[in-house]
Amino acid sequence: MKYKGTMLVVKDIEKSKEFYTKVLGLRVISDFGANATFTGGVSVQTEASWMEFTKCDASFFSYQGNDVELYFEEENFEAFCGKLSEQGVSLIGESATMPWGQKVVRFYDPDRHIIEVGEDLAVMMKRLHAEGLTVDELVEKTFMKKGIIERMLKG
């Protein structure tokens, strides 16, 4: 078996396509009207078509379940956070720095699915190293193997 991607049920597919392309920078690679697939393996399907395929009614859906998230990484994290603010995206709390040093921000898409965007790990490693952490300190802080960290710092 091979995992192929995530499909989100959405109320307004046009609004979702606009969000995922403009806010997250994904590209639509397939558009079948009631279903669209983006780069990165994310797809959206209209609620109406999903109900037709599964024989479920509208009471089946529970948006903003807050129990799963899509995760992305961004090389220019600060600029991305500025873009979220400009677009009026609904944040979940504030951006934060995780205990291992990675900056993250969480927010909702138009159907209240959670999106998390983290600072690219190689960018994080270079930032922490520039702030004075040694490779051994990075191993301790991030729980990553020394060889991986060294490759990230060289890349």
Predicted regions and their residues:
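Conserved short beta-strand elements that form part of the metal-binding/catalytic scaffold
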Residues: 27-64, 114-119
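Amphipathic alpha-helical segments
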Residues: 12-27
